[in-house]
Amino acid sequence: MYLMRKIVFVSCVILGLAACSSQPEQIGGGVYDMKTVQEYNARVISGNTVTQTQKDKITQQIDTSLKLNQSDNKVKTRTRRVLPVLPVTPSVGYHYNYHYFR
C-alpha cells in the first residue's frame, strides 16, 4: 500500500514538472508586412479607417427620401386614452383574511 502511494506520488511529480517546464505552442505567429502594419496603425490613430470610396458607396445605398409606406405622406393625429382614476382606499370587510382563521 505504501509502495503504491509512493509510485503514484512520484509519477504525479514527474508529470507536473514535465508539464510546467515544456514551452507553450506559438499559435498565430504569422509573418506581417511591417509597412502595412505601420500604415494601418497611423490610420487608426488619425481616425481615418474608412476610405472615401467606401463612404461614397454607403451614401449611395442609403436614400433617406425613399418612402417605405404610402401612409408616410399622411398627417397622423394621435388620440390619448384617458383612464378613469380609481381611488384606492383601505377597507376591512367581513371576509378579510378569513382563510387563515379556519
UniProtKB/Swiss-Prot annotation:
It is found in: Membrane. The chain crosses the membrane at residues 7-23. The keyword Transmembrane helix applies. It comes from the Bacteria. It is a single-pass membrane protein. This is Uncharacterized protein HI_1099. GO terms for cellular component: membrane. Keywords: Membrane, Transmembrane, Transmembrane helix.
